[in-house]
Amino acid sequence: MSEEDKTAASAEQPKRAPKLNERILSSLSRRSVAAHPWHDLEIGPDAPAVFNVVVEITKGSKVKYELDKKTGLIKVDRVLYSSVVYPHNYGFVPRTLCEDNDPMDVLVLMQEPVVPGSFLRARAIGLMPMIDQGEKDDKIIAVCADDPEYRHYNDISELSPHRLQEIKRFFEDYKKNENKEVAVDAFLPATTAREAIQYSMDLYAQYILQSLRQ
């Protein structure tokens, strides 16, 4: 057989599929469960004063993201019906539990928007009592502990009246076009916020103990 015939014959033969990397095969056969931000992320050694926050909603966003409690992923709940946007980054404190069976909500004041699903260290400076459609839905007001412009704040009384009014009016108005009633009361100090976080930590611990006993 001539060299030209050999070349033509080899070209006609089907190419063999490359072998998959053994590491890929190994990882596919032994898949591990993905970490859940609510249960697997630690709250932090300095809680309830300084604690981790998982960001769900970016500052300036009109999209209402929220934690999908089953998968641990951040899902789109809805787009806000009004023209307002979230004034600051919004998320939750891991390993906490409130009476509504959700983790503790937090609004984090800082300079920049943060990508949903990331986490940061925050310091509680106050609490905003809120009733959402007849149910208690208080919000912790916090500052990013690693933002040089905000980390020196220790109590909500140190914020300007305009900033407080901005936060209050957002939560009062953001559901009006959905015909849902939200009532916001006067802001409470950092000591009250820390007590609320500690209570939610204790409630979460009780929930875990009950789950283990079942």
Swiss-Prot record:
It is an enzyme of class 3 (hydrolase). InterPro entries: Pyrophosphatase, Pyrophosphatase_sf. GO terms for molecular function: inorganic diphosphate phosphatase activity; magnesium ion binding. Mg(2+) 2 binds at residue 105. Substrate binds at residues 64, 78, 90, 174. Pfam families: Pyrophosphatase (PF00719). It is found in: Cytoplasm. Mg(2+) 1 binds at residues 100, 105, 137. SUPFAM superfamilies: Inorganic pyrophosphatase. Its EC number is 3.6.1.1. Signal peptide: none annotated. Belongs to the PPase family. This is Soluble inorganic pyrophosphatase. The lineage of its organism: Eukaryota, Viridiplantae, Streptophyta, Embryophyta, Tracheophyta. The gene is IPP.
